[in-house]
Amino acid sequence: VGYSGRCFLSRSMSERSGNRGACSQPCRLTYDLVDESGRTVVKGRHLLSVRDLNLSDRIGELIDAGITSFKIEGRLKDVGYIKNVVSHYRQRIDRALASRPGFCRSSVGESRPDFQPDPSKSFTRGESEYFFDGRRAGVASFDTPKSVGEFVGRVARVDGRNFTLAGPHDLAPGDGI
């Protein structure tokens, strides 16, 4: 079908091209999986909802393979996501280039964000390197097409309509869980 950032399904199903910024996001819908005899094998799951591609740990290998330009997905994303992810990749690319004699940036200027970029802190459906090292499991998020967020804790106690979390992070008013 495709993978995050390169889809043809939207155009085929709705005449809206995801590759032109008008994705109808059919991959985020629920589907039933039916076998050849018509028996439903899986019902109402997000069977086409792939995780977000993240090869930031492989930037050096990609540069060594001859990649000279990186496309960073950002369609339908907010400015906070773009700022965070682009800054993250910029730091990774600069670090990789600095350790390779004979390589240099093709542009001038510097970017110095006033925060530590971390894609896991932005909207994410989970991450995958897809098939960078061959076929692997875990490229899809069958349970939800939404941001999976980060682990905040386990429910330690339930008291009527209230519950208590035990975990590694402090929560603040307005945090969504």
Protein language model annotation of sequence segments:
Residues 1-177:
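Surface-exposed amphipathic alpha-helical tracts and adjacent flexible/coil segments at the periphery
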